[in-house]
Amino acid sequence: MATSGANGPGSATASASNPRKFSEKIALQKQRQAEETAAFEEVMMDIGSTRLQAQKLRLAYTRSSHYGGSLPNVNQIGCGLAEFQSPLHSPLDSSRSTRHHGLVERVQRDPRRMVSPLRRYPRHIDSSPYSPAYLSPPPESGWRRMMPWGNLPAEKGQLFRLPSALNRTSSDSALHTSVMNPNPQDTYPGPTPPSVLPSRRGGFLDGEMDAKVPAIEENLVDDKHLLKPWDAKKLSSSSSRPRSCEVPGINIFPSPDQPANVPVLPPAMSTGGSLPDLTNLHFPPPLPTPLDPEETVYPSLSGGNSTTNLTHTMTHLGISGGLGLGPSYDVPGLHSPLSHPSLQSSLSNPNLQASLSSPQPQLQGSHSHPSLPASSLAHHALPTTSLGHPSLSAPALSSSSSSSSTSSPVLSAPPYPASTPGASPRHRRVPLSPLSLPAGPADARRSQQQLPKQFSPTMSPTLSSITQGVPLDTSKLPTDQRLPPYPYSPPSLVIPSHPPTPKSLQQLPSQACLVQPSGGQPPGRQPHYGTLYPPGSSGHGQQPYHRPINDFSLGNLEQFNMESPSTSLVLDPPAFSEGPGFLGSEGSVSGPQDSHVLNHQNLTHCSRHGSGPNIILTGDSSPGFSKEIAAALAGVPGFEVSASGLELGLGLEDELRMEPLGLEGLTMLSDPCALLPDPAVEDSFRSDRLQ
């Protein structure tokens, strides 16, 4: 081209004279130019293809982790070129958080991407569903410069010899596991302030890249000096986890009885998962002395000290000497039911013999208190002592102090089955017993027909720690009067020769009340047992005893046995009674007794709300029935006794019945928290009622 330009005028004249030569020159020129352009394009294609191949190799190497799992492999991404690494800066890196954040650099590179199709800048970071800036610790810039692309094969070995804290799989639980289980040689300093964050990567590489990363090692030494004592304490406790795993506001304080050298948080929680494993934490047991002073009313019901719980609760509730019950009522037997010797006295007690022989009926209170749940005594304590008869004698059937802890069902201790009306571990609401005081003989056969309706035998002995009780010591009784100490299940009449099987769950004797229709019978003779039968309307078909016992376990279980020529007083109210109750009947088949079932069904609406016992006197009574008891009952709220009933000795059932509760009574009885504030006030209140 330059030569033709230099010989321009001469060639022009020659071409004019020789046009063929000129055209040949033009053709040669074009051919040469075409060859040059072809060679140039060839060179450019070679260059472009090599560039593309190199970039493809790089992308394939760095993208291999993305194709394998959803999370990038931190090892391989962290060792690429600087241009691949710059978007990986964590925003925690305070010096570079604005300049080198991934989003900012992506915005700067977008125009350059569109300019040339050959310059494909790496878009592989976008393919990860998570932003890698939050998945990997911030790489130190000096460490990145130490690993150029050319040195990668030499340093592959070091990558795979990194400590276990960097060898993570693609899951969040692996991140937690690797952070929670650092190797002993890894000096991972935990969450440090952002100014010393670059040294975290140095902690992982400590001991393996000593020659290459001296500055990082100095940072580590400074870090160890920077850790003040409170830092060390914080690192040893629950804060030694990455910032993403920190649980705010949970402070685990060691208890005083825990040894000081036991770490509160174990160093290794290696079961995996995104949440820390709390199974190795040794939480101290609850304090033996409760912090709240009111909690002493309800002591721990879980040991062998259930009898002390009972006495403690009773003393708190003011059940002490001054109940106004008359001179012969033995209050200490009620106050500490196991320790007092009056409970150990047997049927040969002179008071009991006197009650057998005297024509005047006496109330023989056989108090065999189980270890009552504290909640049952805490609300209404001892409702049955409101009869106020002056000849109440508390020497009970001798109660042995063996707490039945293994096989005792909810109502383990009381040998009186009337006090086990609901026997399902899920239900704990005690059915109300509107106790019949059957004056005169009743039809035991009709009650015997209704008695085989079963208890629901679904009681489990696991509730024995809730209500541990005092079984009846039947060794001193005659064999025809013994009761199984753990009676429940189908309630049939007591077979008098039944041996005292301690863990019998088959035979439920009905309310063996020692009812003797004639006053002079010896105690060895077989008595007529007062029986309890359900009213038959409970919705459970053949299991009318299967009643909800939701709120309270069995309360104060007492039995007042009244023995007189023709009357028998059967009193066994649970302290908390909700639901239908039981009507007792006694004696042989005579006397119209059909009315008290209807009377009970009329009273059921009261008994569902009230928690006091409904006492119904049924049957014809002899004039020898105690007028003192009638007068005392007339003073108790909820009973109406007519004057003719008092004159006749409470002759008919209609004379003494429970009036429907008013709205005030319902609210007062249905509120389980309506405790009187002072035990002395409650004591005086009960004494006033009984006078």
Curated annotation (Swiss-Prot):
<feature type="modified residue" description="Asymmetric dimethylarginine; by PRMT6">
    <location>
        <position position="123"/>
    </location>
</feature>
<protein>
    <recommendedName>
        <fullName>CREB-regulated transcription coactivator 2</fullName>
    </recommendedName>
</protein>
<dbReference type="Pfam" id="PF12884">
    <property type="entry name" value="TORC_N"/>
</dbReference>
<feature type="region of interest" description="Disordered">
    <location>
        <begin position="513"/>
        <end position="543"/>
    </location>
</feature>
<feature type="modified residue" description="Phosphoserine">
    <location>
        <position position="86"/>
    </location>
</feature>
<dbReference type="GO" id="GO:0006094">
    <property type="term" value="P:gluconeogenesis"/>
</dbReference>
<feature type="modified residue" description="Phosphoserine">
    <location>
        <position position="433"/>
    </location>
</feature>
<dbReference type="InterPro" id="IPR024784">
    <property type="entry name" value="TORC_M"/>
</dbReference>
<feature type="compositionally biased region" description="Polar residues">
    <location>
        <begin position="1"/>
        <end position="20"/>
    </location>
</feature>
<dbReference type="GO" id="GO:0008140">
    <property type="term" value="F:cAMP response element binding protein binding"/>
</dbReference>
<dbReference type="Pfam" id="PF12885">
    <property type="entry name" value="TORC_M"/>
</dbReference>
<dbReference type="GO" id="GO:0045944">
    <property type="term" value="P:positive regulation of transcription by RNA polymerase II"/>
</dbReference>
<feature type="modified residue" description="Phosphoserine">
    <location>
        <position position="492"/>
    </location>
</feature>
<keyword id="KW-1017">Isopeptide bond</keyword>
<feature type="modified residue" description="Phosphoserine">
    <location>
        <position position="136"/>
    </location>
</feature>
<feature type="modified residue" description="Phosphoserine; by AMPK, MARK2, SIK1 and SIK2">
    <location>
        <position position="171"/>
    </location>
</feature>
<keyword id="KW-0010">Activator</keyword>
<feature type="region of interest" description="Disordered">
    <location>
        <begin position="280"/>
        <end position="306"/>
    </location>
</feature>
<keyword id="KW-0539">Nucleus</keyword>
<keyword id="KW-0963">Cytoplasm</keyword>
<feature type="modified residue" description="Asymmetric dimethylarginine; by PRMT6">
    <location>
        <position position="120"/>
    </location>
</feature>
<dbReference type="InterPro" id="IPR024785">
    <property type="entry name" value="TORC_C"/>
</dbReference>
<dbReference type="GO" id="GO:0003682">
    <property type="term" value="F:chromatin binding"/>
</dbReference>
<dbReference type="InterPro" id="IPR024786">
    <property type="entry name" value="TORC"/>
</dbReference>
<dbReference type="GO" id="GO:0005634">
    <property type="term" value="C:nucleus"/>
</dbReference>
<feature type="cross-link" description="Glycyl lysine isopeptide (Lys-Gly) (interchain with G-Cter in SUMO2)">
    <location>
        <position position="234"/>
    </location>
</feature>
<dbReference type="GO" id="GO:0005737">
    <property type="term" value="C:cytoplasm"/>
</dbReference>
<feature type="modified residue" description="Phosphoserine">
    <location>
        <position position="70"/>
    </location>
</feature>
<feature type="modified residue" description="Phosphoserine">
    <location>
        <position position="456"/>
    </location>
</feature>
<feature type="modified residue" description="Phosphotyrosine">
    <location>
        <position position="488"/>
    </location>
</feature>
<feature type="compositionally biased region" description="Polar residues">
    <location>
        <begin position="447"/>
        <end position="468"/>
    </location>
</feature>
<keyword id="KW-0805">Transcription regulation</keyword>
<feature type="modified residue" description="Phosphoserine">
    <location>
        <position position="90"/>
    </location>
</feature>
<feature type="modified residue" description="Asymmetric dimethylarginine; by PRMT6">
    <location>
        <position position="99"/>
    </location>
</feature>
<keyword id="KW-0804">Transcription</keyword>
<dbReference type="GO" id="GO:0042593">
    <property type="term" value="P:glucose homeostasis"/>
</dbReference>
<dbReference type="Pfam" id="PF12886">
    <property type="entry name" value="TORC_C"/>
</dbReference>
<keyword id="KW-0488">Methylation</keyword>
<feature type="modified residue" description="Phosphoserine">
    <location>
        <position position="368"/>
    </location>
</feature>
<feature type="modified residue" description="Phosphothreonine">
    <location>
        <position position="192"/>
    </location>
</feature>
<comment type="function">
    <text>Transcriptional coactivator for CREB1 which activates transcription through both consensus and variant cAMP response element (CRE) sites. Acts as a coactivator, in the SIK/TORC signaling pathway, being active when dephosphorylated and acts independently of CREB1 'Ser-133' phosphorylation. Enhances the interaction of CREB1 with TAF4. Regulates gluconeogenesis as a component of the LKB1/AMPK/TORC2 signaling pathway. Regulates the expression of specific genes such as the steroidogenic gene, StAR. Potent coactivator of PPARGC1A and inducer of mitochondrial biogenesis in muscle cells.</text>
</comment>
<dbReference type="GO" id="GO:0071320">
    <property type="term" value="P:cellular response to cAMP"/>
</dbReference>
